């Protein structure tokens, strides 16, 4: 019974918050809200600068490699397990996967954002 009350309360609260977040921004839309703000001055240039998609892809690739390397951080604690062969196999497999992924990105020129 307590589980049902908790689930119903959470669902109701989430639905209420999503509804409020959906309808609230549409109440007061005027031109000053949609214009860029630079410390009270008129904008010197366009606030919508072009963004390099190649740089974005390099940044995402870096983030993925960084997260994969973070998987190696618990290895010193994992080395104290009784089954050392499994731990070493998984660690070497992860390092091999990182090396192959880096080689693939390098050969496909995915790490260069200048042309």
From Swiss-Prot:
Catalytic activity: a ubiquinone + NADH + 5 H(+)(in) = a ubiquinol + NAD(+) + 4 H(+)(out)
Primary localization class, coarse: mitochondrion
GO molecular function: NADH dehydrogenase (ubiquinone) activity
Metal-binding listed as a keyword: no
Cellular component annotations (GO), alphabetically ordered: mitochondrial inner membrane; respiratory chain complex I
The UniProt record lists the keyword Cell inner membrane: no
Source organism, top-level taxon: Eukaryota
Annotated EC: 7.1.1.2
Subcellular location: Mitochondrion inner membrane
InterPro entries per UniProt: NADH_UbQ/plastoQ_OxRdtase_su3 (IPR000440), NDAH_ubi_oxred_su3_sf (IPR038430)
GO BP annotation list: mitochondrial electron transport, NADH to ubiquinone
Topological relation to the membrane, as annotated: Multi-pass membrane protein
Assembly behavior: Core subunit of respiratory chain NADH dehydrogenase (Complex I) which is composed of 45 different subunits. Interacts with TMEM186. Interacts with TMEM242.
Function recorded in the entry: Core subunit of the mitochondrial membrane respiratory chain NADH dehydrogenase (Complex I) which catalyzes electron transfer from NADH through the respiratory chain, using ubiquinone as an electron acceptor. Essential for the catalytic activity of complex I.
Protein family membership: Belongs to the complex I subunit 3 family.
Protein name per UniProt: NADH-ubiquinone oxidoreductase chain 3
Organism annotation: Ovis aries (Sheep)
């Amino acid at each position: 019974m307590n589980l049902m009350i908790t689930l119903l309360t959470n669902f109701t609260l989430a639905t209420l918050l999503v509804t409020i977040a959906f309808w609230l921004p549409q109440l007061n839309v005027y031109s000053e809200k949609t214009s860029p703000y630079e410390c009270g001055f008129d904008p010197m240039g366009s606030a919508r600068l072009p963004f390099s998609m190649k740089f974005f892809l390099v940044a995402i690739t870096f983030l993925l490699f960084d997260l994969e390397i973070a998987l190696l951080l618990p290895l010193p604690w994992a080395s104290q397990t009784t089954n050392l062969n499994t731990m070493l196999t998984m660690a070497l497999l992860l390092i091999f996967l990182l090396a192959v992924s880096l080689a693939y990105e390098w050969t496909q020129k995915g790490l260069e954002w200048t042309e």
